[in-house]
């Protein structure tokens, strides 16, 4: 069954997320459930519009050590249908959207699901953030 599109995949905010995601090694975009998803090969690291109520939002996987702080920040929400102990959602269309923070969180999410080869390739691009 084909799902209806929830958000215009060419919306400028989605394009901004796309640019960050596709700059990561071997990242691909796959439309699933009528929404753009970004994957490190197969595992999803960013899901656009995971909630029907929030079409201009993304859901991403967090670092376990940072998760609690993010959930206490009013800009983030616990997304439905996701493990709320590891995933958070954030609205993209808010005036206080911090795009630098989102880029860092997207990279963290990618690192959570990427395989060793992909993480090594990212470490070459960003040695200051290497997993040491």
Task: Indicate where each model-derived feature is located.
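Charge-dense, helix-prone N-terminal extensions
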Residues: 1-132
């Amino acid at each position: 069954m084909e799902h209806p599109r929830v958000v215009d995949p060419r919306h400028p905010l989605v394009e901004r997320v796309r640019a960050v995601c596709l700059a990561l090694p071997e990242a691909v975009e796959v439309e699933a459930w009528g929404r753009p998803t970004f994957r490190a090969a197969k595992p999803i690291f960013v899901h656009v519009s995971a909630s029907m109520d929030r079409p201009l939002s993304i859901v991403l996987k967090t670092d376990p050590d940072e998760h609690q702080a993010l959930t206490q920040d009013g800009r983030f929400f616990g997304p439905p249908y996701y493990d709320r102990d590891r995933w958070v959602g954030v609205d993209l269309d808010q005036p206080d959207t911090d795009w630098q923070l989102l880029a860092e969180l997207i990279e963290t999410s990618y690192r959570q699901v990427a395989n060793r080869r992909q993480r090594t390739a990212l470490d070459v691009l960003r040695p200051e953030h290497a997993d040491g």
